[in-house]
Swiss-Prot record:
Expressing tissues: Expressed in cultured primary dermal lymphatic endothelial cells. Highly expressed in polymorphonuclear cells (PMNs) including neutrophilic, eosinophilic, and basophilic granulocytes.
Subcellular location: Cell membrane
Annotated glycosylation sites: N98, N144, N210, N413
Family: Belongs to the G-protein coupled receptor 2 family. Adhesion G-protein coupled receptor (ADGR) subfamily.
PTM comment, free text: Autoproteolytically processed at the GPS region of the GAIN-B domain; this cleavage modulates receptor activity.
Name assigned to this protein: Adhesion G protein-coupled receptor G3
Chain segments annotated as transmembrane: 271-295, 305-326, 339-364, 379-400, 429-454, 475-495, 502-525
Cellular component aspect of the GO annotation: membrane; plasma membrane; specific granule membrane
Length: 549
């Protein structure tokens, strides 16, 4: 399954445990599902067993939210003790010790995954995995404390579902590098906006081609279980590893995610721009042709099917136009202008998805339901849905300030393309729900209807079929036309692996969707009734239009 972010990007180149719970008096305890704040050896071993199971397989018995919060809060529990502590388990290594705030030197700690973190002196050889805490961090702490508690934690989250979040549950090869989290905490305080950032060095081998490394932290405020965010962190790739510079303290990791190099982005952008330009020409021809037919043929004033086709073509025309303006403008203009371009592009993208769904709904009435298909003011109601529903979604998304500058970077973290979309650092739930989730619903509905319609077409009796000689060719043309109307090619972004060939096919086919629609419209409506390719579909259109009168 391809990355949900891949749909937007390709188109644009295109455990706070609850307290007060009573123990059940009967039945066995299920600590994997339960939540508590007990850190004695008995409860700790229970949680460790659950954590191990979830790390390995992501069992249904896992309460991911509770387990994640449990281990995040375990660090805070260690901070409450007064003595230096070391924790050494197969998946958790932790060091807690007192540090003087009146220091003249930065503090260094090793982060070797197989060892408990330890303080490293300035004159020692620096370990490949390490963290540097600037002295200014301790001097800026509130309360004029002379001594503070510092906790350094290394957590192996394994390949399961823990600490994955929506950004990594995409099946596109993304993941936490070496399944390792590094936690930093000082004095049980929420430390943010450091004047001098801390530095974490992750050593690793050279990443695979078309993969990039990004420094992130676990943001517990995102959603119900938290998610990864890169806000406040910068990424610098060095020969010895990747350096993360962040202006706050929390749990950090290095994400490995698919990316596109500059040459690929450039080629895809040119393909998309050329395809969109050609598509706009054909879509404009479709709209003009419909206007001509509406003036010259009386039946086009009452038929709903041509109106729906033209509405879809209009939404795609405006979507292509918004895309060309967006790519051409890049980061130019004010933040408000970028917000507007992102909102307009999002709106017409949702309009295109909606009209594809309405095309499928109309096909359902024509070929599947057939009888009792009368709806008063049918096209008006479809228009309210096709143009109004996306507007409501964009208003809701825009009110959360989700639009802004979006940057596509290559594996060296160089900017490949800038445009206005969902801004970086914002919650991605709006993107997942209003773009990928919404498209998935309309796409699956369209596929079900298309399958039913194709089955009907290919099982027509010989009495109503056209001549045997050209039957198969005409059926194939009908299938291709219907596929264009319901947006079959968009499924490449959801149901196929995000390989380079898929990227090119997606960019080409979707930018040329307008060409397919124009050819379908011309073949279906321009010739006389006797030479129409899909006579069965035309008769269905006429029958449905008659029922609306």
């Amino acid at each position: 399954m391809a990355t949900p972010r891949g749909l937007g990007a390709l188109l644009l180149l295109l455990l706070l445990p609850t307290s007060g719970q009573e123990k059940p008096t009967e039945g066995p305890r299920n600590t994997c599902l339960g939540s508590n704040n007990m850190y004695d050896i008995f409860n700790l071993n229970d949680k460790a067993l659950c954590f191990t199971k979830c790390r390995q397989s992501g069992s249904d018995s896992c309460n991911v939210e509770n387990l994640q919060r449990y281990w995040l809060n375990y660090e805070a529990h260690l901070m409450k003790e007064g003595l230096t502590q070391k924790v050494n388990t197969p998946f958790l290594k932790a060091l807690v010790q007192n540090l003087s705030t009146n220091t003249a030197e930065d503090f260094y700690f090793s982060l070797e995954p197989s060892q408990v973190p330890r303080q490293v002196m300035k004159d020692e050889d620096k370990p490949p995995d390490r963290v540097r805490l600037p002295k200014s961090l301790f001097r800026s702490l509130p309360g004029n404390r002379s001594v503070v508690r510092l906790a350094v934690t290394i957590l192996d989250i394994g390949p399961g579902t823990l600490f994955k979040g929506p950004r990594l549950g995409l099946g596109d090869g993304s993941g936490v590098l070496n399944n390792r989290l590094v936690g930093l905490s000082v004095g049980q305080m929420h430390v943010t906006k450091l004047a001098e950032p801390l530095e974490i060095v992750f050593s690793h081998q050279r990443p695979p081609p078309n993969m990039t490394l990004t420094c992130v932290f676990w943001d517990v405020t995102k959603g119900t279980t938290g998610d990864w965010s890169s806000e406040g962190c910068s990424t610098e790739v060095r020969p010895e590893g990747t350096v993360c510079c962040c202006d706050h303290l929390t749990f950090f990791a290095l994400l490995l995610r698919p990316t596109l190099d500059q040459s690929t982005v450039h080629i895809l952008t040119r393909i998309s721009q050329a395809g969109c330009g050609v598509s706009m020409i054909f879509l404009a021809f479709t709209i003009i042709l419909y206007a001509f037919l509406r003036l010259s043929r009386e039946r086009f004033k009452s038929e709903d099917a041509p109106k729906i086709h033209v509405a879809l073509g209009g939404s795609l025309f405006l979507l292509n136009l918004a895309f060309l303006v967006n790519v051409g403008s890049g980061s130019k203009g004010s933040d408000a202008a970028c917000w507007a371009r992102g909102a307009v592009f999002h709106y017409f993208l949702l309009c295109a998805f909606t009209w594809m769904g309405l095309e499928a709904f109309h096909l359902y009435l024509l070929a599947v339901r057939v009888f009792n298909t009368y709806f008063g003011h049918y096209f008006l109601k479809l228009s309210l849905v096709g143009w109004g529903l996306p507007a409501l979604m964009v208003i809701g998304t825009g009110s959360a300030n989700s639009y802004g500058l979006y940057t596509i970077r290559d594996r060296e973290n160089r900017t490949s393309l800038e445009l206005c979309w969902f801004r970086e650092g914002t919650t991605m739930y709006a993107l997942y729900i209003t773009v990928h989730g919404y498209f998935l619903i309309t796409f699956l509905f369209g596929m079900v209807v298309l399958a039913l319609v194709v089955w009907k077409i290919f099982t027509l009796s010989r009495a109503t079929a056209v001549k045997e000689r050209g039957k198969n060719r005409k059926k194939v043309l009908t299938l291709l036309g219907l596929s264009s109307l319901v947006g079959v090619t968009w499924g490449l972004a959801i149901f196929t692996p995000l390989g380079l060939s898929t990227v090119y096919i997606f960019a080409l086919f979707n930018s040329l969707q307008g060409v397919f629609i124009c050819c379908w419209f011309t073949i279906l409506y321009l010739p006389s009734q006797s030479t129409t390719v899909s006579s069965s579909t035309a008769r269905l259109d006429q029958a449905h239009s008659a029922s609306q009168e």
